[in-house]
Amino acid sequence: MQIQKLNSSKLFYNKWPYKIECYILGASRLKWLGAEITKDFCLGKPTPTLWSWQSNDRLSLRDKSALLEFTTGIEPFLELKEQLQVRVEGRRYNIYCKDRTLLENIYNAVSPWVQQVSGPTTEEELSYMLDNGHKKILRDILPKDIYQYRIYFKESWKIEDRIKFLAWAIKNPNIVDISKGSKEWLEGGKRWVYNPFIYVKDAHTLTMVGLHSSGNVKRVEEFILRENLVTA
């Protein structure tokens, strides 16, 4: 299996710089029932039954053998709860961590099932990401080659005030960029949108948005070019 290595731009879940994405049938069983019960299941021993959305009991003997091997490989790391986090999405078993040595050890233990590894490629990028959390995002190029900031708005923003803000933003198309979904929410066409956002050109525009949004800015992210990392 070909492994895709990606250069991440920010911390995962505002905490973890590294991510290992694995694909394994039975991932949900391992997540919800733990390593010991999963190994018993793979060996044909009686085990608790999960809801259908949590697991698939119809694994072939080959699938069970693979799950047993994967579980045995990842089990020693599951005790390191302060050093890593596991999230399961269907058959994708994702592991997040901070330490590159730990990343490499996990990779070596479960490499046959690894599809993708993401993280900073240099110590400078790692240090920068840990120091700045989710506030600054590393990029090779700016969004649409121009926008330096992404602004998220509070979902509780009143419709009448959103409409006023949108009217201002439409008059400034060269410094503000709004996605279709966020625009529909701003104009009242959608009652609720998760994390509505816009892109803005520069710090001056950021200030203007703050003035026109009536205190409804939830979060601001700044894009930093990797080539400028030393001076950022």
Specify the residue positions occupied by each region the protein language model found.
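Structured alpha/beta or helical-core interaction and ligand-binding surfaces enriched in interleaved
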Residues: 1-191, 221-232
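Alpha-helical oligomerization segments
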Residues: 191-232
